[in-house]
Regions:
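Detector for the c-type heme attachment site
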Residues: 46-49, 77-84, 162-163
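Gly/Gly-Pro-rich "capping" loops immediately C-terminal to redox-active cysteine motifs
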Residues: 57-122, 143-149
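C-terminal capping alpha-helices of c-type cytochrome domains
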Residues: 40, 119-136, 140-166
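Extended surface/linker regions that mediate inter-domain or inter-protein docking
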Residues: 20-21, 25, 156-160
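Electrostatic cytochrome c docking/interface patches
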Residues: 25-69
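N-terminal Sec-pathway targeting helices
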Residues: 1-15
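Short sequence/structural segments immediately N-terminal
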Residues: 4-5, 34-38, 70-72, 156
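Short loop/beta submotifs within extracellular cysteine-rich repeat domains
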Residues: 51-53, 86, 107-109, 135-137, ...
């Protein structure tokens, strides 16, 4: 009797999980992220869906469509609605400090390890999005995806990061 109850409960949890995975894209704005967003950049930042209605493929070393989908695939999932990031607790209670990615922050000089680092250019921001490499050659932390985005998509995201700075 106990085994049958556990089996029924297990199947019920499985069904709830599958229903959740299938319906979440529609809740956040359609299966293609097509809710009302004022710009392509806002849509990508908020949902992860690019100009063709698909989530851009992640590059090796990042997440994206693979295991990372369990953690989310949109910038907002880690960097928050305002782009300021902050402390994020992930699965297994692991916490990371997520950086502020507003344009004003990325393009301003800052102190790092006692040295002043120059602000990033638009092409350096694009490179970090695509390859996960900072202008100084250091790799971004592993949770940060490396996205195979079109020039239009990257430009739209950078423009949206500028909007977050206002």
């Amino acid at each position: 009797m106990k085994n049958k109850t556990l089996l029924v409960m297990g199947l019920a949890l499985l069904v709830v999980g599958v229903v959740g995975i299938v319906t979440v894209p529609y809740i956040i704005g359609g299966a293609d992220g097509s809710a009302d967003y004022s710009t392509l950049g806002e849509r990508i930042y908020s949902t992860g869906y690019g100009e063709n209605g698909q989530i851009p493929r992640s590059m090796p070393g990042g997440r994206g469509r693979g295991a990372g989908m369990m953690m989310g695939a949109a910038c907002v999932d880690c960097h928050r609605e305002d782009g300021r990031g902050g402390r994020l607790t992930m699965m297994m209670r692991q916490s990371i400090d997520v950086p502020d990615i507003r344009y004003s922050t990325l393009t301003s000089s800052h102190d790092e390890n006692g040295e002043t680092e120059p602000g990033w250019t638009d092409s350096e921001i694009a490179e970090a999005i695509r390859t996960g490499v900072e202008p100084n050659g250091e790799q971004l932390r592993a949770p940060m995806p490396r996205w195979d985005m079109t020039n239009t998509e990257v430009d739209a995201v950078i423009t949206y990061l500028e909007e977050l700075s206002k």
